[in-house]
Structure formats: C-alpha cells, structure tokens
From Swiss-Prot:
It comes from Ctenomys leucodon. It is found in: Mitochondrion inner membrane. The keyword Nucleotide-binding does not apply. One of its GO terms (biological process) is mitochondrial electron transport, ubiquinol to cytochrome c. Component of the ubiquinol-cytochrome c reductase complex (complex III or cytochrome b-c1 complex) that is part of the mitochondrial respiratory chain. The b-c1 complex mediates electron transfer from ubiquinol to cytochrome c. Contributes to the generation of a proton gradient across the mitochondrial membrane that is then used for ATP synthesis. CDD domains: cytochrome_b_C, Cytochrome_b_N. This is Cytochrome b.
Length: 379
C-alpha cells in the first residue's frame, strides 16, 4: 500500500513541494528568505483580516477607527503594529531575496525571476495603498503626490489620475477603492507566489556555486524544514522586538496628525522601503523623466538575464563582480538616505550622482566586468 502522503491528490502536491523535494546540499542561509517571505505574507493577511474587522474606509472615521483599534480593541495595538512592522520585515526580506538572486545568478531561471519582479511590483502597490488607509497627513499627501505622477503620461495622464481618484482630488472615493484593492491584492499575491514556486520547481533551486547540483541532492524535509524554522525564529524575535520596544521607529510622526488637505507637510516622503526609488524620482528635474526613471529603477531587474554576459553563473568566484555588487548595495543605501532628506544642496547633487551610478553600474559596468573576467580566465 502506498503512503497517503504520496498518493493523495492534494497531499502529494505538498509532499513534492515541501517534503520529498530534492534540494541542493549546499544552499546557504541566503536561501531562507523565500520561506520567510511566505511567513510574512501569511502574517500580513492574518493581521490585516483582523484589522479590517474594526477599520472603516471613510474619510471622516478612518483615522478615528485606527485610534479605536489601538485603544479599545483587545490587543488591537499589537495587531496594528505587527501589520505595520510586518510590512517593513517583508520588504527587508524581499530586498535580501532579490540581492541573493543577483549575486548567485538565480535570474537565469527567467520565468521564476520575471514572476518575482511582478510579485515585487504588486507588493509595492499593496504597501503603498495600505499606507494611505490610516488617513494621516503623510497618508493623504503621499497618495496625492504618488498618484499625481501618472498625470505625466502624455495625452491620457490627467484623465487617468482623476479616474484613479474618483473625483478631482484624493477623497472618500479614493480611500474606499484603495481599501478594496489593499484587501484583494494579498490574495492575488498568494496566487502569484504559487506560480513563482511552480516555475521554480520546474528547474529546481540554484546553489552558491552556480553549478548543476543534480548529482548531490538531499530531501527538503527534515534538512531545510528545520533550517527554515530557525530562520522563522530569528524573524519572530526581530519583529516582536521592534513591535514591543519601538513600534514607531520606522513610521513617520506626521501620520499621527489627521489628514488635512489645507496643510501640506514640509517634507512629503513615503515609507523607508520606497525611499531609494523616491530619491531616483526626485533626482530628475522633469516630471515625465522622473516617472520613467522611477519605473526603470524597478523594471531594470527584468534585464538582468539579458545583461548576464559571464561564462559563470554565480558571483562566488568572480571578485571584480563582487566588488560591483557591493558597490550597488552601498549605492542603494545612499539613495535610501537621500530619499528621506529635504530637497536642498548637497542632497540634490548626491541623489543625482547616486541615481546615475545605479543605472551605470547595472547597465554598463556589470556586463563589461563580466566580459573582462571571461577574458582574464581565457574563456
């Protein structure tokens, strides 16, 4: 008699994905982020569901309903801050996951990679709409500034913006639709994650060496299940420390003031995880140019499989490419810092230089270095 785990139509899918899955024997802790992202998504859906039970998507009561959740609902403050800081953890893991993919050449699995980029875009849209919901000052003005960028699209721009707003400014209609989208998108993300995994399991995982690991595979369970549990523990400790000791560390104090269309905050900025893209947007003194640069800063990821000119897949044995990779990471940290600074000298110049370096490194320096390494190795 066959084991139910291997014969049951539903359980066997789980078995092939998480139990008997052949995995490379040498994947490092950098391969933990996929499961951590899955956990984050589950946590966000769960905490979000409980928040939605008490939240009202109406301009007059949205801010008060969030205050009510924090003050009057049992452990409402905990649910709210787990949701807010859970989003930050989500993006930290996303950026690590993408960085791992770039470093070890995982983008050569083009289907999996492109699905991942679409996942990133959808997650960014979800997070942006979620930030609007508490209807504080930064929620309102962030929504106004970011949606207004679409007006830079020639011909259809202004009409498109008013269509998204549901009126002539960010108002009740905007808040209601943003809540509807913010609720539905995580479920769409879950479906996309399943497709992402489907594509991944067609090829199997990459590994730090970048070489084929078919000759040395081990079962996912118990080896990597226990490893994922360890990663999960680290995540829970970090998240709960953040939630319990400094829940507002990553937030903006302006969002504790109710939205006021008649009073513009001195510095409008998004959440920290969008600051690098915001800095790129602001570094171009032209609206359409800025919007195109903003879109390119994310969509450039889709070009990585084409720009891969090295004969080796991974950067593990390519010291010059490693230097460029860490230069890119530092550059993104500088952009993140600049995105949170006021638009004045010297920040404008630093932002412009960092933005230029970002595109120059990814589009020109990295492919040229790969060719040079091939030459040095006489390949």
């Amino acid at each position: 008699m066959t084991n139910t785990r291997k014969s049951h139509p539903l359980i066997k899918i789980v078995n092939h994905s998480f139990i008997d899955l052949p995995a490379p024997s040498n994947i490092s802790a950098w391969w933990n982020f996929g499961s951590l992202l899955g956990m984050c998504l589950g946590l966000q859906i769960l905490t979000g569901l409980f928040l939605a039970m008490h939240y009202t998507a109406d301009t007059t009561t949205a801010f008060s309903s969030v205050t009510h959740i924090c003050r009057d609902v049992n452990y409402g403050w905990l649910i709210r801050y787990m949701h807010a800081n859970g989003a930050s953890m989500f993006f930290i893991f996303l950026y690590f996951h993408i960085g791992r993919g770039i470093y070890y050449g995982s983008y050569t699995f083009t289907d999996t990679w492109n699905m991942g980029v679409l996942l990133l875009l959808t997650t960014m849209a979800t997070a942006f709409m979620g930030y609007v919901l508490p209807w504080g000052q930064m929620s309102f003005w962030g929504a106004t500034v970011i949606t207004n960028l679409l007006s830079a699209i020639p011909y259809i721009g202004p009409t498109l913006v008013e269509w998204i707003w549901g009126g002539f400014s960010v108002d009740k209609a905007t808040l209601t639709r943003f809540f509807a989208f913010h609720f539905i998108l995580p479920f769409i993300i879950t479906a996309m994650v399943m497709i992402h995994l489907l594509f991944l399991h067609e090829t199997g995982s990459n590994n730090p060496s970048g070489m084929n690991s078919d000759s040395d595979k081990i079962p996912f369970h118990p080896y990597y299940t226990i490893k994922d549990i360890l990663g999960a523990l680290f995540m829970i400790i970090t998240l709960m420390s953040l939630v319990m000791f400094s829940p507002d560390l990553l937030g903006d104090p302006d969002n504790y003031a109710p939205a006021n269309p008649l009073n513009t905050p001195p510095h409008i900025k998004p959440e920290w995880y969008f600051l690098f893209a915001y800095a790129i947007l602001r570094s171009i003194p032209n609206k359409l140019g800025g919007v195109l640069a903003l879109a390119s800063s994310i969509l450039i990821l889709m070009l990585f499989p084409i720009l891969h000119l090295s004969k080796q897949r991974s950067m593990s044995f390519r010291p010059l490419s490693q230097c460029l990779m860490w230069m890119l990471v530092t550059n993104l940290l500088i952009l993140t810092w600049i995105g949170g600074q006021p638009v004045e000298y010297p920040f404008i110049t630093i932002g412009q230089m960092a933005s230029m370096t970002y595109f120059f490194t990814t589009l020109i320096l990295m492919p040229l270095t790969a060719l040079m390494e091939n030459k040095l190795l006489k390949w």
